[in-house]
A protein has these predicted regions:
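Hydrolase active-site cap/lid region
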Residues: 67-123
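Short alpha-helix in the alpha/beta-hydrolase fold that links the catalytic acid
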Residues: 129, 138, 152-161
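Alpha/beta-hydrolase active-site loop
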Residues: 27-48
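Catalytic active-site module of serine/aspartate enzymes centered on a nucleophile-bearing elbow/loop
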Residues: 183-200
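Conserved alpha/beta-hydrolase
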Residues: 1-23
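Catalytic histidine neighborhood in serine/cysteine hydrolases
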Residues: 160-178, 185
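Alpha/beta-hydrolase fold nucleophile elbow
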Residues: 47-59
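Short beta-strand/loop motif that positions the catalytic acidic residue
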Residues: 135-137, 142-144, 148
């Protein structure tokens, strides 16, 4: 948040549900969190109706802002910046099951889907950033490291291609998962503020 506050932005960094000091029993992988995010947006607007809001998230936070992008957002939301977001909950779990444990998506994910439906009350097949960005109207900046071994770079490419809104993309060479801002901080933040200056 420091780079944003230095540019004069007010910064809000909430814990996502069931993480840090936030309440909740189940991590929503972005799908449940997008509704929490909209509550934060509404709270900001209630305090200042003229607020211009930028949504910025990394990893699961990136999935959250992408999943929110396809919902009806207030006109105060001016841009979305996502760093290392995944296409869907199903896709990231399938990718990890294969990469980490050499397990097939079926029947592992199908069993997980039943548990998620029962316990957390959401369908992991429905929880798709890819489907949401197709409906997005707010400009989106997609950022990814080409050495990400958790969320593969191809997911960023698919998300970028699916988005019909104003968009841009930054791929940082040799950066792992959410490492882009540390690998090339000047490039990273210059791109963000250049992107934001174009949409004000």
């Amino acid at each position: 948040g420091r780079h944003f506050s230095e540019k004069g932005y007010n910064v809000l960094i909430p814990y996502m549900r069931a993480t840090g000091e936030s309440e909740g029993e189940y991590i929503g992988m972005g799908w449940l969190d997008k509704d929490d995010l909209k509550c934060w947006i509404d709270l900001i607007i209630k305090q200042n109706n003229n607020s211009n809001i930028i949504l910025h998230g990394s990893s699961m936070g990136a999935a959250t802002v992408l999943m929110a992008s396809g919902d009806e957002l207030p006109s105060n939301v001016k841009a979305i910046i996502e760093d290392s977001g995944y296409t869907s909950v199903w896709d990231i779990f399938a990718s990890e099951a294969k990469a980490r444990f050499n397990l097939p998506a079926f029947p592992v994910l199908n069993m997980f889907e039943i548990v998620a439906n029962f316990r957390a009350k959401y369908d992991i097949k429905e929880a798709s950033a890819l489907e949401q960005v197709k409906k997005a109207t707010v400009p989106i900046l997609f950022i990814h490291g080409d050495n990400d071994d958790f969320v593969p770079e191809y997911m960023c490419e698919k998300l970028y291609e699916a988005a019909n809104c104003k968009k841009d993309k930054l791929i940082i060479h040799s950066a792992g998962h959410t490492e882009s801002r540390y690998k090339e901080p000047e490039t990273y933040y210059n791109k963000i503020f250049e992107f934001l200056s174009d949409i004000k």
